[in-house]
Regions:
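Active-site-proximal beta-strand/loop segments in catalytic clefts of secreted hydrolases
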Residues: 1, 31-35, 207-210, 241, ...
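Conserved, well-structured beta-alpha core segment at the onset of a catalytic domain
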Residues: 1-63, 250-251
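Soluble non-cytosolic domains of exported or imported proteins
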Residues: 4-12, 180-187, 242-249
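Structured segments of extracytoplasmic/periplasmic soluble domains
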Residues: 13, 17-20, 24, 192-203, ...
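Surface-exposed patches in mature extracellular/periplasmic domains of secreted proteins
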Residues: 30-32, 197, 201-209, 263-272
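Acidic, Ser/Thr/Gly/Pro-rich low-complexity segments that form flexible
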Residues: 42-199, 207-231, 246
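Histidine-centered active-site loop/cap adjacent to the catalytic His
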Residues: 228-280
Length: 283
């Protein structure tokens, strides 16, 4: 995966673009970054998504019993991990809807350590436990995980259920730590965007606030209301990231309003309802 762009690199690159814009145009609009963690790609799949009956939960817990009660305390005793990390790594399923087990690359990688003494675990088990923990309510499970959770990692092994016996890969989870990094970077980027808009007397759009309106009740238009709900909200396409035609029409109106307000223009807004969106049908 790519690292998050350094805030100084971002500022320098955007400053070059704004300089080029000023050299070739008499105005423009800068748009800040919305809270990407509030789009359907990150909000549709619930963190608690693994249904288990009492017997299955007990059977799974039995498989993790030695890990919880012996391996983790020993690693704390050996100062390989902290008590706090050991607590985060505990696995416990119960009757009802459970949090899946996930791989978290911010945890200490135990895959090699567990293959040596005193654990002496076989490589497949050690690798499985290497950065494993159970998800929490604060983790964001990505939309593509909906087609992965509950399936078999190995079709020939009926016990290799992803989220129960095999961790969901890190790429399909945005952990709280990663969310913090995104928030920090976004705040720095947005400060740069707003500063450059002011310094260069350009129109400015607060897309972050606009998206917040979609997630907090929606935005009314003639004929309906746009929200950030997946499929039914009308704003986002099936990938959960890009807008629908109707969503893009709303974005166009936001930009038009900013241009008209800043430059005294009279660009007409579009009728959002004239543009299509996802249609749910039983046919």
């Amino acid at each position: 995966p790519n690292d998050i762009t350094d805030a100084n690199v971002f500022a320098a690159a955007l400053n070059q673009q704004v300089t080029a814009l000023n050299a070739s145009a008499s105005g423009g609009v800068l748009v800040n970054l919305s809270d990407v963690t509030s789009i359907p790609y990150f909000t549709t799949v619930p963190a608690q998504s693994i249904p288990l009956d009492a017997a299955t939960a007990a059977a799974v817990n039995a498989q993790f019993a030695l890990y919880n009660t012996q391996v983790l305390p020993l690693l704390v005793q050996l100062q390989v991990i902290t008590q706090a990390e050991a607590g985060a790594r505990m696995v416990n399923f119960e009757e009802g809807i459970n949090f899946p087990i996930i791989s978290d690359d911010d945890l200490t990688d135990l895959s090699q350590i567990l293959q040596g003494p005193p654990a002496n675990l076989p490589p497949p088990i050690a690798n499985l436990l290497g950065q494993l923990r159970q998800a929490t309510a604060d983790d964001l499970i990505l939309l593509p995980a909906s087609s992965v959770l509950g399936t078999l990692a190995n079709p020939a092994d009926p016990l290799s259920v992803i989220g129960v016996a095999v961790p969901l890969v890190d790429q399909l989870v945005l952990t709280t730590t990663e969310q913090g990094r995104v928030a920090t970077a976004s705040a720095a980027y947005n400060a740069t965007i707003q500063g450059l808009a002011a310094a260069n007397d350009l129109a400015y759009v607060d897309a972050r606030s606009e998206l917040a309106q979609l997630t907090q009740g929606g935005i009314a238009y003639d004929g309906g209301t746009l929200t950030s709900d997946y499929i039914t909200g009308g704003s986002f396409s099936l990938d959960g990231v890009h807008p629908t035609s109707r969503g893009y029409a709303h974005v166009a109106n936001i930009l038009i309003r900013a241009i008209n307000a800043k430059y005294g223009a009279t660009v007409p807004q579009v009728n959002i309802g004239d543009y299509g969106t996802i249609t749910v049908t039983n046919n």
